[in-house]
Amino acid sequence: MELGKTKRVHIVGIGGAGMSAIAELLLKSGFGVSGSDLSSGEVTEKLAAHGATIYLGHQASQVEACDVVVYSSAVKPEDNVEIAAAMQAGIPVVKRDEMLGELMRYKSGICVAGTHGKTTTTAMVATMLIEAGESPTVMIGGISDYLKGSTVVGSGKYMVIEADEYDRAFLKLTPTIAVLNSLEAEHMDTYGTLEDLKKAFVAFANKVPFYGRVICCADWPEIRGIIGSLNRLCTTFGIDEPADVSATDIVMANGRTTFTVQAFGEVYPGVSIAVPGRHNVQNALAAFATGLELGLDPARLVHGLGCYSGMRRRFQIKYDNGRGLLVVDDYAHHPSEVKATLKAARNGWPSARIVAVFQPHLFSRTREFASEYGWALSRADMVYISSIYPSREKEEDFPGVDAGMVAGAVTKAGGKHVLYVSDSGELKRLLLEEASAAGPRGTILLFMGAGDITAMASEVARCGEKENL
């Protein structure tokens, strides 16, 4: 890959999921990469091991040797000294999605969009293509067990990308195949209304060339509603609604899901994926439909889905004591994702006591969806709510908004056992008590959220292993 005379790229916020993935892609493509972030960790250490120069904190001098500066939507350009220094020095400054769009020029793009399921579906497509011998280039906003990372630089013609709708980023991409996995109200700080969000999805899908294809989930009403606005060829997939590609005979047991695919009059039995939940069957159908559109052998698609081994923080089992105690970490942070994750746990382990540990993400999202979170979480046997993870927001901008709103909504929705625990040490103590008290019916400690609740899941898992809970 070449980007004119560009040899060295500096990335502001390099430790984020999306930014670290593009950093890894650039490194593997032969570019020099430097980057800055406010904290270090496993991700930045891995990038450093691959040759990136990592800076802790932001300083103007750190951009002096670069040819371009890339930043994410989470970074405010007007508040960042590195971006200001680059602009003053005449160094080009671009958003991540613009850089990604440029890199896509060299490949045939398969872009997976949707409010939910983007990461998993992208990884499933990538796994299938690799197993089919296609050697794709891949970039996912998460860590794939199969890929052992978030990026792959392949020699084949396909580039598989997770397409993020936040800040309208996906409108800079150039897909040949666009997957619309799901669609409902989200990122209202960007879009303002659901109608505006739907228009953005239509614009994204219509970026597909006349010879391409849009793969649409028929189970989502909002996606069904926009199909008529697409001026491109469409393939539909789904479970509950009539579709070109559908699933029957769905069976969930011990964390795996098996089913039969029916596609365009043909039947493909024996599909098995290493993750629970009907939502993951939908994700697999999206991947299968994509493979069919590429003309791949259906037998290889079935095999490829069987090789999919999950994603970090997507119903990731962190600890299994073999006696019924599971510690599970999941990225679910939207009410629909929380609902689907809890349903997957209930269907996969019907007799287990489900203890939900939820960290609300963003004050704005908590304010908007407190009631919906309550209904979703009320399905658990016990619910613990931690403090809100603010991410890019400031608490003082949202007076009166706290995680207690979610706890109250759980009670209002019929949840009988819920605790809002703001102190992380106390929360850990209570969860270890839950683990120690796990009985013969089994207990699932299900951690959910897009913030640092994942660290708590890891701590509890480590304690479980150390103390043989």
Swiss-Prot record:
Catalytic activity: UDP-N-acetyl-alpha-D-muramate + L-alanine + ATP = UDP-N-acetyl-alpha-D-muramoyl-L-alanine + ADP + phosphate + H(+)
One term of GO molecular function: ATP binding
InterPro entries: Mur-like_cat_sf, Mur_ligase_C, Mur_ligase_C_dom_sf, Mur_ligase_cen, Mur_ligase_N, MurCDEF_pg_biosynth, UDP-N-AcMur_Ala_ligase_MurC
Pathway connected to this protein: Cell wall biogenesis; peptidoglycan biosynthesis
Cellular localisation: Cytoplasm
Task performed by this protein: Cell wall formation.
Protein name: UDP-N-acetylmuramate--L-alanine ligase
Naturally occurring in which organism (per UniProt): Chlorobium phaeovibrioides (strain DSM 265 / 1930)
Lineage: Bacteria, Pseudomonadati, Chlorobiota, Chlorobiia, Chlorobiales
